[in-house]
Design a protein with these regions (language model features):
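Conserved GNAT acetyl-CoA-binding A-motif
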Residues: 109-122
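C-terminal "cap" of GNAT-fold acetyltransferases
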Residues: 82, 124-126, 147-174
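Conserved active-site alpha-helix within GNAT-family acetyltransferase domains
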Residues: 99, 125-143
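A short beta-loop-alpha structural element at the N-terminal edge
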Residues: 2-16
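Glycine-rich phosphate-binding loop
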Residues: 92, 96
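Helix-loop element at the rim of GNAT/NAT acetyltransferase active sites that forms part
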Residues: 16-33, 46
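Acetyl-CoA-dependent GNAT
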Residues: 8, 30-91, 102-104, 108, ...
Length: 174
């Protein structure tokens, strides 16, 4: 398994990966038809200083997963990395790949952006596996957005706001 920055050469594989993950109605927020070439191209722009993106490949170079996040553009919030999305291809889920990818991503965030003090994300309240993963990485539940997410069947589910915060001493101890 290799974790590395995404490159423009990954665009087609990223498109296929995100579309495969979007087939699960309880997975990522985007619907399959919202996973477009333009969307994937926008992810490839999440490179320093505006954001960070990593992919994980197997020994044969096949893309198994991707994670990305971006900084807020307003100066009062530039210490925050937000919009975190992690995807692992359905064939590779449940094998620790997402946790390894996310762990490396957080190390890279600390190294690349020493001024980041907060990494934030949202998860469906019903996505217990994701909530457990995020908590195992140190994220804390900060609140609930009632009925924020509309499911494909028209029903609504709460979203859980989560964050991982760093202090000045964390920069040197992790």
């Amino acid at each position: 398994m290799t974790i590395r920055p995404a490159t423009p050469a990954d665009q087609a594989a990223l498109l296929a990966l995100h579309r495969a993950v979007a087939q699960d109605p309880n997975g990522i927020a985007r619907m399959p038809d919202e996973i477009t070439d333009a969307y994937i191209a926008s992810l490839l722009n999440l490179q320093p200083p505006v954001g960070l993106q990593r992919v994980v490949t197997d020994e044969a170079g096949e893309l198994m997963g991707e994670i990305h996040g971006e900084r807020y553009r307003l100066r009062i919030f530039t210490h925050i990395l937000t919009g975190i999305t992690v995807v692992v291809h359905p064939r590779h889920q449940g094998r620790g790949i997402g946790k390894a990818l996310f762990s490396q991503f957080l190390r890279d965030v600390r190294q690349t952006f020493p001024d980041i003090r907060r990494v934030e994300l949202e998860a469906r309240a019903t996505n217990e596996a994701s909530l457990r993963l995020y908590e195992s990485l140190g994220f804390e539940r900060e609140g609930v957005y009632r009925n924020k997410t509309r499911n494909r069947d028209g029903s609504f589910v709460d979203s859980v706001a989560m964050a991982l915060t760093f202090t000045e001493s964390d920069r040197y101890s992790r």
